[in-house]
Amino acid sequence: MPLFDLKSPYPPAGDQPQAIEALAKSLKNNNHYQTLVGVTGSGKTYTMANIIAQTNKPALIMSHNKTLCAQLYSEFKAFFPHNRVEYFISHFDYYQPESYIPRRDLFIEKDSSINDDLERLRLSATTSLLGYDDVIVIASVSANYGLGNPEEYLKVMEKIKVGEKRAYKNFLLKLVEMGYSRNEVVFDRGSFRATGECVDIFPAYNDAEFIRIEFFGDEIERIAVFDALEKNEIKRLDSVMLYAASQFAVGSERLNLAIKSIEDELALRLKFFKEQDKMLEYNRLKQRTEHDLEMISATGVCKGIENYARHFTGKAPNETPFCLFDYLGIFEREFLVIVDESHVSLPQFGGMYAGDMSRKSVLVEYGFRLPSALDNRPLKFDEFIHKNCQFLFVSATPNKLELELSKKNVAEQIIRPTGLLDPKFEVRDSDKQVQDLFDEIKLVVARDERVLITTLTKKMAEELCKYYAEWGLKVRYMHSEIDAIERNHIIRSLRLKEFDILIGINLLREGLDLPEVSLVAIMDADKEGFLRSETSLIQTMGRAARNANGKVLLYAKKITQSMQKAFEITSYRRAKQEEFNKIHNITPKTVTRALEEELKLRDDEIRIAKALKKDKMPKSEREKIIKELDKKMRECAKNLDFEEAMRLRDEIAKLRTL
């Protein structure tokens, strides 16, 4: 029976059918690695969705940055509205890991800020994987970082049934063991409250509903689900499965074993420091670890508890830590891992372990942490790439690694469903590049189209932006200090024609879907390096491939080897696309989706609230608007539209002060 119900208004087209067939066949033949080489705008995401539906396995889709993860999450939610599409990225808004700088004798404490919504989504992902098979998880590099033991997590899980005998007091203690905190004042995610024989539990992995358990003596008489906002009953249940409030929750038996294991390791390490006559490190480690043990014994947690993860999971020293892969593979279940933009993602995954190990080794050496802290780490690249699952690498420009691993299991997706061609390209002398590009920009702007310009340095981007602004052009630039929300706002403004030219350095590559852009200019294209490598050039040139008038200008003094390879690949693809269009009588046409749909503009409620004279508004009317805005705010947060959610939150706060 099919696990996944793929919904789409259009069938596969262009090169999609043959790519789907070839890759699905390779996966069904149990090949470990396969690669999809798909050009920009060829519908790689839709191909991925079809492959998931055909292979009928839970899937993990990994990408190298949060912006692309959010984009993929939105698209897969639309493709699979009746399945469990989950989101798993870092839950930190801000994170400063603990570290020690010996030459300055400076210890930097860990400092972090956890995003409540992202934490909920992470818990939702792990609980879905433990309870269902029709799950697709969109994840960042966070999927490679350590988590609790999924089998221990299942042990802590509770199935609650109507009619079963349970001591009321023991039930409350069990909730505490599962990581839930009692709070009679602020009832929110991960908490419970008890009034008389009625216990309300707000699951940590759900912000829309809470569960009410009603006792009669020591018997569960009734289970109901309530809407968290409206406080009205939604449905009654015969039983409910309640998962722990944390992925690191463990039972009392495992907790006691962990404490004993930490004590044993501490004794060995203190003996080592004493033998080495390192009394400063001896006293430092003794004081810090004993304090942590006191906290763990009393509350089950301590600050920096992740550094003791090996003791709680039961792993041996240097053994591969538990991570999201273990939740996907629970009960020896088969699953598929899709690595999107693999040419960037795989090198990023490969560099994670070394940086983490370097920092923690210093902490261990100077007595700030036990050696077991080194086992709280991301996966090594070999551990990741040899996981017991199937891999599909997806990229317009795969590296040698992906192609070598996949051998003959490589599918090309060069023909776009829209008939659009890879852009024309032209090399021009870089001596007068600023003036020459200015003349080209005027022609593009006259056609009501947009321009992307990529430079090598931030200074050049700023100066170019300044020059063109002085010459009367509407221009802005993006740099690395701009956060994801502001970045999306700038891209939205470009599409809405609030300005015509966007200048950047390394921000104009993967994941930018801008059909309005018909001209991409690459300044100093002959300066060999990461930003002007074959892969970077092809990716950047691809930004002009969503417009029928797509054109790329490369300013250079010479044609480098990277440029030559990029030109050969682009020319090959364009020739193949032109031949296909000629045979099938297709005329390339720019496909522009409705901006309102694409950009998710959700201003209606705020406009209504602002238009009303709030100080004259009847209290009942004001409460009604607050309720509507609150509901919309939660929807926005659930859909990861945090910018709109924050605006709605601020508007609600203003209304409540009246």
Swiss-Prot record:
GO terms for molecular function: ATP binding; ATP hydrolysis activity; DNA binding; excinuclease ABC activity; helicase activity. ATP binds at G38, V39, T40, G41, S42, G43, K44, T45. Residues 623-658 form the UVR domain. InterPro entries: Helicase/UvrB_N, Helicase_ATP-bd, Helicase_C-like, P-loop_NTPase, UVR_dom, UVR_dom_sf, UvrB, UvrB_inter. It is found in: Cytoplasm. A motif (Beta-hairpin) lies at residues 91-114. Residues 25-178 form the Helicase ATP-binding domain. Residues 433-607 form the Helicase C-terminal domain. One of its GO terms (biological process) is nucleotide-excision repair. The beta-hairpin motif is involved in DNA binding. Forms a heterotetramer with UvrA during the search for lesions. Interacts with UvrC in an incision complex. Belongs to the UvrB family. This is UvrABC system protein B. It comes from Helicobacter pylori (strain HPAG1).
